[in-house]
Amino acid sequence: MTGLAIRNISMRFDLPNGGSVQALQDVSLDIKQGEIMSVLGPSGCGKTTLLNIVAGFLAPTDGVIELNGHEVHGPNAERGMVFQKGALFEWMSVRENVSFGPRMKGERASDYSANVDHLLDVVGLQDFKEKAIYELSGGMQQRVALARCLANDPDVILMDEPLGALDALTREKMQSLVLKLWKETGKTIILITHSVEEALLLGERLIVMAPRPGRIHKEYRLPFADEGVDADLREVKKNPKFAEVREEILGMIWDMEEEIMGRTEASA
């Protein structure tokens, strides 16, 4: 399989006053199958817009998305989405949520049950499978969301700030789980985050986007995701290279934010 191709994507939103906003301009990326890539940038750089175009929720103004050599039109089961809030069915049990996709596709329970149980084991929720969603903590709910996404067996997993609302310790545990699932499943993962450290930990490839219009500013190839599969993430962060790249990116984004503020003040 050839993976995911983002070809010259531009996105313009028309405004009620007759004007428009250029959210993305000529974004191109080739993402190989099994790659984990993080996308980072200041607010307004088009990160989520790009993810929604890849998911098929938005049609770009220009450009195309191709998955395994076929042009993407609208959402389908080949691309799974995990949101900041799990978008789970609170009245259903954990197991019912995880098995929702296969059930909606008309699969027989005998065909999907073993995989659902395996996924519940992987995310550490087998003992909670009969619990209702509202009985779970935020971190546990995000584990359910991950398992539900994987139960549909997508080629690509799209994650829009899925760990942003979690406390620091739970977030670190979830970061380790994401890396474990990446290695175990071989899925392509694209993760949007506002956290520089998270982007470094969860991206063997890291894309920094610049705003107005949203575009690729810089790309990094990093060893930390591979290291984090087997190592304690706190130890990974002690790598001098980790600190060096973190400071470089923080400075880069700071400068972008300063430029945005300058533009805003000049137009006021």
UniProtKB/Swiss-Prot annotation:
MF terms (GO), sorted A to Z: ABC-type taurine transporter transporter activity; ATP binding; ATP hydrolysis activity
Membrane topology category: Peripheral membrane protein
EC number: 7.6.2.7
Residue ranges of domain ABC transporter in the record: 4-236
Primary subcellular site in the record, as a coarse category: membrane
Keywords recorded for this protein, A-Z: ATP-binding, Cell inner membrane, Cell membrane, Membrane, Nucleotide-binding, Translocase, Transport
ATP-binding among keywords: yes
Binding of ATP, residues: G41, P42, S43, G44, C45, G46, K47, T48
InterPro entries cross-referenced by the UniProt entry: AAA+_ATPase, ABC_transporter-like_ATP-bd, ABC_transporter-like_CS, ABC_transporter_ATP-bind, P-loop_NTPase
Family affiliation: Belongs to the ABC transporter superfamily. Taurine importer (TC 3.A.1.17.1) family.
Subunit structure: The complex is composed of two ATP-binding proteins (TauB), two transmembrane proteins (TauC) and a solute-binding protein (TauA).
Protein name as annotated: Taurine import ATP-binding protein TauB
Organism: Jannaschia sp. (strain CCS1)
Lineage summary: Bacteria, Pseudomonadati, Pseudomonadota, Alphaproteobacteria, Rhodobacterales
